[in-house]
């Protein structure tokens, strides 16, 4: 009864008004699964390829009709009749059908939409919530959220070169309370910015994008907001950075244009180390450029026991690249973005490899999102322990937080919230 009998792909719009792919999968029993894929603004060069039409007369060339056509023709022909409960076999069929290392023929946006929709249909068929379908009876750990409250870099139009400054409610007793901590700090920060005459408009991921004189000034405002909201920085709420350093790495230097600095990897590491000593920062994502593995080595040797060092553009949810990083002792954590690799099976493999190596895995959204909340279920289903899904505004971000609130309610007394223990790679 779980045989796939119909697949329909369509072009919809994401949270930035750009086209993305949605897919419906119908099973023999009449059950349907639907999924929509996200899209990133700052992307790693080795990510799986998101297929765009390139037709400048439609959506500035960003249409996805080619990817949709692939779903409705080639992919449909290949997977009709397959058992939706055999996720690994289905994903292998998609990988083999594409035939490239980076999904460039069919498009990772096409393969992922199908992979996700099939999983949703199979979960529905089994009468299980998606997180339980992914993780079985052992899925009970809620993720610690990394909440992006200040945007810079490619996610904003201000003088901050770092892409995200985040708050992390490590001292909350539950996920529900963690969300409350974050929301109250978000509103406190909004008032601080308003009182200073700064913009309170939000960026792609729901964070504020004020023009402040320096990164430290932004950090200090966040600390002020934590205090104003009645919380203790470092104990109840820690800080995280997403440098997205590839975006400001030019000719072997880290160029912080907003602060007039041009630094080599050692000098940039020294600045990050100074901030770590000065502020309650426990996570730094993409602290070095994706191609600067020597810089990553310097950063990891200096801060790898103190701080979670997350590879996003560095690892692009790819087990081959992650294994190389593990072997070379580069970073100590991986960011998991489902559309960087293009199937759920490959996503789960990256999470498992990270855990076996003592690396943490942070499940992540993209800057271009939809109302699809699959990553919330992945975070709980894999017991990942951490999720990064934006600020406390914009319904495309809240869709994930709200799904996690529902999951915690569903789990009841067996739900756990790891807090600081989610950062198990730190000594």
Swiss-Prot record:
EC number in record: 4.2.1.11
Main location, first listed in the record: cytoplasm
Cofactor names: Mg(2+)
Gene3D superfamilies assigned to the protein according to its UniProt record, in alphabetical order: Enolase-like C-terminal domain, Enolase-like, N-terminal domain
Annotated binding of (2R)-2-phosphoglycerate, by residue: 163, 337, 366-367, 388
Catalytic activities: (2R)-2-phosphoglycerate = phosphoenolpyruvate + H2O
NCBIfam families found in the cross-reference section: eno (TIGR01060)
Purpose of the protein: Catalyzes the reversible conversion of 2-phosphoglycerate (2-PG) into phosphoenolpyruvate (PEP). It is essential for the degradation of carbohydrates via glycolysis.
The family this protein is said to belong to: Belongs to the enolase family.
Record protein name field: Enolase
Source species: Polaromonas sp. (strain JS666 / ATCC BAA-500)
Name of the gene encoding the protein in the UniProt record: eno
């Amino acid at each position: 009864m779980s045989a796939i009998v119909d697949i329909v792909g369509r072009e919809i719009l994401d949270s930035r008004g750009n086209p993305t792919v949605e897919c419906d999968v119908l099973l023999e029993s009449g059950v349907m699964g639907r999924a929509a894929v996200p899209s990133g603004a700052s992307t790693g060069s080795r990510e799986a390829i998101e297929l765009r039409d390139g037709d400048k007369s439609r959506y500035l060339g960003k249409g996805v009709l080619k990817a949709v056509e692939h779903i409705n023709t080639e992919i449909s022909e290949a997977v009709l009749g397959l058992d939706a409960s055999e996720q690994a076999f289905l994903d292998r069929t998609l990988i083999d059908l594409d035939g490239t290392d980076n999904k460039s023929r069919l498009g990772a946006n096409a393969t992922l939409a199908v992979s996700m929709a099939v999983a949703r249909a199979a979960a529905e068929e089994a009468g299980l919530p998606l997180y339980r379908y992914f993780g079985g009876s052992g899925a009970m750990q809620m993720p610690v959220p990394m909440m992006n409250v200040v945007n810079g870099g490619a996610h904003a139009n201000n003088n901050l070169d770092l892409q995200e400054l985040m708050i992390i409610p490590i001292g909350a007793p539950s996920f529900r309370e963690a969300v409350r901590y974050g929301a109250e700090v978000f509103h406190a920060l909004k008032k601080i910015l308003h009182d200073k005459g700064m913009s309170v408009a939000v960026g792609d991921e729901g964070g504020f994008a004020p023009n402040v004189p320096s990164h430290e000034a932004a950090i200090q405002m966040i600390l002020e907001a934590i205090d104003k909201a009645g919380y203790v920085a470092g104990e109840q709420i820690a800080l995280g950075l997403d440098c997205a350093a590839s975006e400001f790495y030019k000719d072997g230097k880290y160029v912080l244009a907003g602060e007039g600095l041009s630094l080599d990897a050692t000098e940039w590491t020294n600045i990050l180390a100074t901030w770590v000593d000065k502020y309650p920062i426990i996570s730094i994502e993409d602290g070095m450029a994706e191609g600067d593995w020597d810089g990553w080595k310097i950063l990891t040797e200096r801060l790898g026991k103190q701080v979670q060092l997350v590879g996003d553009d560095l690892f692009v949810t790819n087990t081959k690249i992650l294994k190389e990083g593990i072997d070379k002792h580069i970073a100590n954590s991986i960011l998991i973005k489902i559309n960087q690799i293009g199937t759920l099976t490959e996503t789960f493999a990256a999470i498992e490899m990270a855990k076996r190596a003592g690396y943490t895995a942070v499940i992540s959204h993209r800057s271009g999102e939809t109302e699809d909340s699959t990553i919330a279920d992945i975070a709980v289903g894999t017991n990942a322990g951490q999720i990064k899904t934006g600020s406390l505004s914009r319904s495309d971000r809240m869709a994930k937080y709200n799904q996690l609130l529902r999951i915690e309610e569903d789990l009841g007394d067996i739900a756990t919230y790891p807090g600081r223990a989610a950062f198990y790679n730190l000594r």
